[in-house]
Amino acid sequence: MYDKVKLVLHALPIGYNWQSVLSRIVAYSYRADGTGGLGWWHGRTIIATETCVSFEGSLPKSLWGHNTHTMSLNDVECCIMMLSEDLGVPMYDAEVEYVEFAHNFEMSQPPVFYLRKLSGIKGFTPNDWAEGKGGTVYFDKEGVRVKFYDKISEAKKKKELPKVGRSSLPEYLFQLYL
């Protein structure tokens, strides 16, 4: 399902004020010309200006603080509605500038076992520069990048494991990222 997205709301409501959006979140920077600023919402970037409001970041990390679970469509809707409510603007009407998809697969063997076998994906060329990147394999074809990696190892490195329910996580979790 969806992972990282960039949403931009250009159809601003009547009475919109970018300062009120930033006052509802953790604002950390303002434009010198006084036309907008940046802030954080659940650790993800919000930009509010006179002409638009944008969100950029991982939806599951915004909702749960990690992305070791694949989001359902209902989870995505819940997250965007929560974003809209917290910012005070209808982000559910925003345009999607880009979206990255991810899905987690529970595996019976360590992900490195499968990573070695992926070089045979038809039509995709593995990137040589990804060698030694800690168990991540990238493939490119016609502007599409597919990434496979050991999600549990990555989450441990970044300290993004869920605070509750760690024991119920699968031992081997493989993530496909598109």
Model-derived segments and spans:
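Structured, helix-rich domain cores that form ligand/interaction pockets
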Residues: 1-178
